[in-house]
Amino acid sequence: MSKYKKYFNIYIVLVVFAVLGSLFYFLYSSYMAEKKQNNMRVFFDYHVKQLNKSIDDEKFSSMAISILLAQNESVQMCLLGQDRDECVKNIENLTKTLGAASMYNNIKLHLYDKDLKSYVRSWDLNRYGDMIASGRFLVQESRRQNKPMVGIEAWYAGVHIRAVSNVMHEGKNIGSIEVLLNYDSLGNFYKTQGIDLFVLLSKDKMPAHKSAPSDQILSEYYIENLSSANLNIVGILRDIDLKKYEFYVYKTHYFCVVPLIDASNTQIGYYVLHVNTDEKERNISQNYLESEELF
């Protein structure tokens, strides 16, 4: 009997050790998971500040360019002479010159006449004469306040960092010039840091939009930096309620969600930063999918 009691006691001790070991492992795992999440929150806090700083830098840069272009003699003369062909040639040359710098290789220029009608779009030379400025906050504010304006704005060409300056000649306003920068250079920069950037525009905040197959990648948002976005993680992104989460974890994937605010102080979408802490999986996913592969 004492022999069985001895084995029973040993069994009880082993069970207690197993329970305590499991409990310790659970508590340790929970602690490490919480510690990792806290570390990732600190990591994202830093990079959100860097993102905002980078956007501010691009705003400053685009405004400086718009001011210089507004003072460009060739731009002023073609507007004064109402010579659109000459303006087209000048805008093409200026776009090409600025685009030689890597951070401006996707720069767009938009020239307006004195009545704020579209005169030359560098990305669509055949489309002009439309009076779209009535719905454009920055263009209207620049004219109303008679000073350069800069901010983020969504319109037919998509979400851009936009800067608008009035073109003046002998004290008279003869037109306006707008500089548009997209988010691809920022997206590519973050890629080198092992971070994915998504610039998401709410579909119900887009006043006008040229349809494309990639519009269906996400049901509620347009991906505005499509060429630099990591489309391999779209499947996870689709399941995140961006209105609900500022920080989201799925397995080894960490997401930080930041409101995208336009020049009129209206939220029009989100910036999403993503990091995969699984280095092997992250390296494989660097071979980004083309948008067509999602359909």
Model-derived regions, located:
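Solvent-exposed, extracytoplasmic
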Residues: 86-103, 136, 147-150, 168-215, ...
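Short beta->alpha transition motifs characteristic of CBS
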Residues: 122-125, 181, 272-278
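N-terminal signal-anchor/signal peptide hydrophobic helix marking the start
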Residues: 3-18
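Extracellular/periplasmic juxtamembrane segments that couple receptor/chemosensory ectodomains to their
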Residues: 227-295
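Extracytoplasmic/periplasmic ligand-binding sensor regions of membrane-associated signaling proteins
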Residues: 100-102, 117-177, 243-249
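Juxtamembrane extracytoplasmic/periplasmic/luminal helical "stalk" adjacent to the first N-terminal
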Residues: 6, 19-81, 100-107, 147, ...
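A short, hydrophobic, proline-anchored segment that marks a local hinge/packing element in signaling
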Residues: 162-170, 182, 255-265
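Amphipathic coiled-coil signal-relay and dimerization helices
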Residues: 112-113, 117-123, 162-164, 207-220
